[in-house]
Amino acid sequence: MAKKSMIARDAKRKKMVERFAAKRSALMAAFNAAEDPMERLEIHRKIQGLPRNSAPTRMRNRCWATGKPRGVYRDFGLCRNQLRERAHKGELPGVVKSSW
């Protein structure tokens, strides 16, 4: 189980990303469309002025059951240990033990 403070920090970052997503995407579109170097520099400064935690790259994929940050499968949102346990119990629809 991950520390509760780290889970809370990631939840806070997720909210921040959602709150600034529209503004950040509008600025990025303007930045990519601008051809004048001075205009691009001005837009870049505006992007840098946004909160650091509003960037989507600062979010971390975590297991929703345990909060572990590593070994998380995107399709399920579970870490490898939880995925294995729940698959053996039959709690994951469509997941079967392989045999060949």
UniProtKB/Swiss-Prot annotation:
Offer a single GO CC term for the protein. small ribosomal subunit
Highest taxon of the lineage:
Bacteria
The record's section on SUPFAM superfamilies has:
Glucocorticoid receptor-like (DNA-binding domain)
Q: Which UniProt keywords apply?
A: Ribonucleoprotein, Ribosomal protein, RNA-binding, rRNA-binding
Name one matching Pfam family.
Answer: Ribosomal_S14
Gene Ontology terms for molecular function: rRNA binding; structural constituent of ribosome
Query: What GO biological process terms does the UniProt entry carry, in alphabetical order?
Result: translation
Q: Describe the function of this protein.
A: Binds 16S rRNA, required for the assembly of 30S particles and may also be responsible for determining the conformation of the 16S rRNA at the A site.
- State the PANTHER family in the record: 30S RIBOSOMAL PROTEIN S14 (PTHR19836), SMALL RIBOSOMAL SUBUNIT PROTEIN US14M (PTHR19836:SF19)
Q: How does this protein assemble?
A: Part of the 30S ribosomal subunit. Contacts proteins S3 and S10.
Q: Which family does it belong to?
A: Belongs to the universal ribosomal protein uS14 family.
This protein is called what? Answer: Small ribosomal subunit protein uS14
